[in-house]
């Protein structure tokens, strides 16, 4: 069993050496002078058998704290949601198991239809006209939205709310360096974008205004009030949104958003360090020919049968690299399929019910913290996340929680100096009353 997972026998080696006309490994590398060859013993452990290797790897994996072994109240862009069991079954099928979008429609109708359904459901959730087949994640989707806005308006200034996810903001700034865009961060006030500060920065040079809905603090941004400011000087209105929240919130498209992006992770994609995720990108029809990424369209063949194809490909870098709207090629088709299967399994009513449960449980948790004497930092309407202030450093608090089998909330002091000792708590539909009560008790006892 020693070499079960590395089937290279001495006979195999000799056959290969004979094929290339040498007698030994030393002869194969005879061109390398002795003076530069490594001398001495290699500091490499002996090979393990497969059972030994599996045992060691399982022991290493057991050191991880994950959402199967711990109760999680950590969100901040990655959430612990229910994933219907059918999701893994479907995406594991060999005809689906790829991250690529198919170039040959005649042999890929099933996958193309699944992607088309993903695009359709994203449009329904966001209230937009066209959605692409996926982006890498929410951050890169938002950055591409900034680039599209600048290219469409021929302007260079991007107004980015400070209440947008910090990592999304970092990605936008990175993407902005190439074309030389100026990114101006707009401060928040009472947990949402400061409209007075936004108004003060608006001028003819603004390509777009970017906000998040719900924002990083879980608060619901007043899109109705932001839209006229964004469009006052013919700029674009860009909204990054949690798609699950759109099961109950008014879609950004109904507030006049030009571009809606986000991360489909809440639908069928496990929460794991480093991803992968699945970004979505939706626009009004006027921007259809400038949207980045792949588009699947519906058509009919010569016999009148419905079919699906990649459409408007002249926008893409594999057709006209120098004139492409984006350099994205391979995307997250497999995760888009997972999101599509999850949304289909839940159905419209299921998505709404799941979103409603998030709201109800998060608000129960907030009231429980208030009853225990905690200060809730922002008092506006929120979805499934809210901010509390502790008397002690959040890193220290979370270490104690981890010892109790609880993954605590996000330490906002890492990104917002004014929010030191503030924790962003996420409560999804999977959290029970008992789990919430336990968190409140543990934090209350530790905060005393």
Curated annotation (Swiss-Prot):
The keyword Ribosomal protein does not apply. GO terms for molecular function: glycine dehydrogenase (decarboxylating) activity. It comes from the Bacteria. Its EC number is 1.4.4.2. GO terms for biological process: glycine decarboxylation via glycine cleavage system; nucleoside metabolic process. The keyword Membrane does not apply. Keywords: Oxidoreductase. It is an enzyme of class 1 (oxidoreductase). It catalyses: N(6)-[(R)-lipoyl]-L-lysyl-[glycine-cleavage complex H protein] + glycine + H(+) = N(6)-[(R)-S(8)-aminomethyldihydrolipoyl]-L-lysyl-[glycine-cleavage complex H protein] + CO2. CDD domains: GDC-P. HAMAP family: GcvPA. The glycine cleavage system is composed of four proteins: P, T, L and H. In this organism, the P 'protein' is a heterodimer of two subunits. The glycine cleavage system catalyzes the degradation of glycine. The P protein binds the alpha-amino group of glycine through its pyridoxal phosphate cofactor; CO(2) is released and the remaining methylamine moiety is then transferred to the lipoamide cofactor of the H protein. Belongs to the GcvP family. N-terminal subunit subfamily. NCBIfam families: PRK00451.1. This is Probable glycine dehydrogenase (decarboxylating) subunit 1. It comes from Anoxybacillus flavithermus (strain DSM 21510 / WK1). The lineage of its organism: Bacteria, Bacillati, Bacillota, Bacilli, Bacillales.
